[in-house]
């Protein structure tokens, strides 16, 4: 029986474990904090649970246009408020429940789970340290799926009370009076949008000239317009030089010397791979300058028999991609039929209000001449159903080959964009016009 050892219990790890078990391998999975990884315990599941409440609040706030009244109260915002302590209790409860569900699935497939830390000792041995002591596990195949953690700025050390990373916000008992969000990437934009909808005064500090610098420019423009309309302060081309805690809040000093005061500060400036202390050098596993493990399209590292999946590889850091990388690794390691990872049909979503979803070739690639394609944009403002639902902001943009009109990419901005984008993904995969 093939022995498989997996380091990391996130989507890349537990999905690989399920595939390995189904292919009759002897599978052991190790994680320090519990099954589900950051996706379940501190990132995707918690943030999307928080965002679910934010979406409901947005619907309530915009319901007046559709003729909804709450008694005789004219100011709906004064009636509809949130209990952040209850929201965060629900967040933690759902994360724990999902982790338990994953544990149950793995147990049913006879996968051994060890709560502890692990490191490689060569390309065929994993050393595990747990409450039961140290154990050496020999392996025919090893998968490293250790994820990543929030990048910490020396000028903004988190204290878990006023200066926070996105893993610490779920300990808050009360809604911040004024939240300063540093970083306008996906994580920063999502939290800024969510807390704005929950009723918090939000200041979004972006070092670039627009929010979501890595996303479609037209989509980012729509989002920034909506956020400002809803009362958010967006400071573009403003780099945070220092964050200092005061007696009852925080002061953020910008690079131009100006300051912004708030009650709390959320730092969302990217991630760092969890690859230190794993013994990768003992197996000659190559990492890049940022510490991410280099892999090919079937998740192989530079070391024979050692695979990697998920955020620790830096390959399109999405839970769905991590899961597919893990499955591909097991199919390849265990000799099953395998199709290399193809990111051109993988959609990525930003769960702001409105949502932003993209797939395939981008506007930037088209403009740079990387692919010969033309774009077609359909604003939601002119769509009959959008009008019925009171939707004013957003669009559908498709990138198509000249002549046959084959769809090669797309962007959707609007309610449920994360679901609508799947039709575009299928069109790309099927070569539809």
What residue spans do the PLM features occupy?
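Beta1/beta-strand and adjacent pyrophosphate-binding region of the FAD-binding site
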Residues: 1-12, 175-185
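Core beta-strand elements of the Rossmann-like FAD/NAD(P) dinucleotide-binding domain
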Residues: 1-2, 132-141, 255-264, 302
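Glycine-rich flavin
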Residues: 2, 18-25, 30-175, 203, ...
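Flexible, glycine-rich terminal cap/loop adjacent to redox cofactors
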Residues: 5-12, 16-33, 38, 45, ...
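Short glycine-/small-residue-rich Rossmann-like dinucleotide-binding loops
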Residues: 10, 31, 147-148, 266, ...
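Gly/Ala-rich phosphate-binding loop of Rossmann-like dinucleotide-binding domains
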Residues: 17, 21, 192-197
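FAD-site-proximal beta/loop scaffold in flavoenzymes
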Residues: 159-176, 259-335
């Amino acid at each position: 029986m093939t022995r498989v050892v997996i380091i990391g219990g996130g989507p890349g790890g537990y999905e690989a474990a399920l595939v390995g078990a189904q292919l009759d391998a002897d599978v052991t999975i190790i994680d320090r904090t519990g099954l589900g990884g950051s996706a379940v315990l501190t990132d995707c599941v918690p943030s999307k649970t928080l965002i679910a409440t934010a979406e409901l609040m947005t619907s309530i706030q915009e319901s007046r246009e559709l003729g909804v009244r709450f008694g005789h109260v004219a100011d709906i915002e004064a009636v509809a408020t949130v209990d952040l302590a209850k929201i965060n209790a629900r967040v933690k409860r759902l994360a724990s429940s999902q982790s338990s569900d994953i544990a149950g699935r793995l147990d049913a497939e006879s996968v051994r789970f060890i709560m502890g830390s692990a490191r490689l000792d060569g390309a065929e041995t994993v050393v595990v340290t747990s409450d039961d002591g140290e154990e050496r596990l020999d392996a025919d195949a090893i998968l490293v799926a250790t994820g990543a953690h929030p990048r910490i700025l020396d000028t903004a050390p988190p204290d878990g009370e006023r200066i926070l990373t996105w893993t610490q916000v779920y300990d808050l008992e009360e809604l911040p009076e004024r939240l300063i969000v540093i970083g306008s990437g996906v994580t920063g934009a999502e939290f800024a949008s969510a807390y704005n909808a929950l009723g918090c005064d939000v200041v979004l500090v972006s070092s670039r000239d627009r929010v979501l610098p890595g996303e479609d420019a037209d989509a980012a423009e729509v989002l920034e317009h909506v956020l400002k309309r809803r009362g958010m302060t967006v400071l573009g081309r403003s780099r945070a030089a220092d964050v200092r805690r005061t007696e009852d809040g925080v002061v953020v000093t910008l690079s131009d010397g100006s300051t912004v005061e708030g009650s709390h500060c959320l730092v969302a400036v990217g991630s760092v791979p969890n690859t230190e202390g794993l013994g990768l050098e003992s197996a000659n596993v190559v990492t890049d300058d940022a510490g991410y493990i280099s892999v090919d399209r079937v998740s192989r590292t530079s070391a024979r028999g050692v695979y990697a999946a998920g955020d620790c590889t830096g390959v399109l850091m999405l839970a769905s991609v991590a899961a597919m990388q893990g499955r591909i690794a097991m199919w390849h390691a265990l000799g099953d039929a395998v199709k290399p990872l193809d990111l051109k049909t993988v959609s990525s979503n930003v769960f702001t209000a409105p949502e932003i979803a993209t797939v395939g070739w981008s506007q930037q690639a088209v403009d740079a001449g990387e692919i010969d394609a033309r774009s077609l944009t359909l604003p939601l403002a002119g769509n009959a159903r959008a009008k019925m639902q009171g939707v004013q902001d957003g669009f559908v943009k498709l990138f198509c080959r000249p002549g046959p009109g084959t769809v090669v990419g797309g962007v959707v901005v609007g309610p449920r964009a994360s679901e609508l984008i799947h039709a575009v993904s299928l069109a790309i995969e099927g070569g539809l016009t």
